[in-house]
């Protein structure tokens, strides 16, 4: 559904010389100092690409550095307990990425001798790696000629070539993939791939794009027709579900009792507050060797995920606790003084900081 009467042909200069313009622009104006750009090591490239999924560069940089400090090789990552990986990931969100990261490392080490395959089709067979991510890893690590199509690239192509429709729709996505494949240059694939990422992240932004500085400014369909705000088409709106969860915040003055979440679901594998209704607080405290002294409801805390909004309703329970550790592996008493630096889900940390002794 290429609009404007066949915009790929209309934007002749852009269609014929898209890659050349983009590469020249990237060489002069693109990003060159990101930490993962200084290597072709597939482990480091893969780590950066997984972290960058749905996450801004500025957020990824410190996590990337900490991960490499803790796990400088894929062998060390594969051998680490999953809890260590999840704790290091805490705060970056989308925790399935961390679980797939760990599983992928184990597959590469255990089945592939610690070496990533070179071809994008082979890389895409590994856990947690889709077609676009596989192409980026293959291009940056091995110079393979493969097309990427993440959210930023979809926006660039939809605007430049006038592709109509929501990019997440199967028919539109297929069209964008075909377009992305057709534009691949014969050489300099690394600069071209990085240029696409840079253009979408720095100039062809979702709102208020910097069209005058864009290397495609004179051939972009969206700019020529003043449709930057319309392309790409927005996702059809539907109501985002609202969920509520009752949690207990059990403290003995210095510590808080936390539960290790199941591997799947939100905050999978991380420590969080137990989901218990207020009416069950006393029985819950007794079951964990505590005597309930006082209860106080906290203000509801709202947190948004990709597919739903969550309201946490926490009951702060002050208890006299058995000073021994938790009796079951899934339960841990954590010192409240360490909460600020602890690897916890963001909303859980906010609740705990609100009750931490000053």
Please give the residue ranges for each predicted region.
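Intrinsically disordered, low-complexity, charged terminal extensions of DNA damage-control enzymes
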Residues: 1-32, 37-38, 201-358
């Amino acid at each position: 559904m290429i609009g404007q009467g066949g915009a790929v042909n209309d934007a002749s200069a852009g269609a014929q010389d898209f890659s050349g313009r983009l590469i020249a622009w990237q060489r002069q104006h693109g990003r060159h100092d990101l930490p993962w750009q200084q290597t072709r090591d597939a482990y480091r490239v893969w780590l950066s690409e997984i972290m960058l999924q749905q996450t801004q560069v500025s957020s990824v940089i410190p996590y990337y550095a900490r991960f490499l400090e803790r796990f400088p090789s894929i062998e060390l990552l594969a051998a680490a307990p999953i809890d260590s990986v999840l704790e290091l990931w805490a705060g970056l969100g989308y925790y399935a990425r961390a679980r797939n990261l760990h599983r992928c490392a184990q597959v590469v080490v255990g089945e592939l001798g610690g070496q990533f395959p070179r071809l994008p089709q082979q890389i895409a067979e590994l856990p947690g790696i889709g077609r676009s991510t596989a192409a980026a890893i293959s291009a940056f690590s091995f110079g393979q000629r493969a097309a990427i199509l993440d959210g930023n690239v979809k926006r660039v192509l939809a605007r430049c070539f006038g592709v109509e429709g929501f990019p997440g729709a199967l028919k539109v996505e297929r069209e964008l993939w075909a377009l992305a494949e057709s534009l691949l240059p014969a050489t300099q694939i690394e600069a071209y791939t990085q240029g696409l990422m840079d253009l979408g992240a720095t100039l062809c932004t979702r709102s208020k794009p910097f069209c005058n500085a864009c290397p495609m400014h004179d051939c972009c369909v969206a700019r020529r027709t003043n449709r930057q705000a319309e392309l790409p088409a927005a996702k059809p709106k539907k109501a985002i579900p609202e969920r509520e969860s009752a949690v207990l915040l059990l403290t003995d003055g210095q510590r808080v009792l936390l539960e290790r979440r199941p591997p799947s679901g939100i905050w999978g594998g991380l420590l969080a507050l137990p989901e218990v209704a207020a009416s069950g607080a006393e029985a819950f405290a007794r079951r964990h060797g505590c005597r309930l002294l006082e209860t106080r409801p906290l203000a509801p805390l709202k947190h948004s995920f990709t597919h739903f909004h969550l309201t946490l309703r926490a009951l702060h329970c002050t208890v006299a606790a058995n000073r021994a550790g938790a009796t079951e592996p899934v339960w841990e008493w954590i010192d409240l003084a360490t909460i600020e630096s602890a690897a916890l889900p963001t909303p859980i940390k906010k609740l705990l900081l609100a009750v931490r002794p000053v």
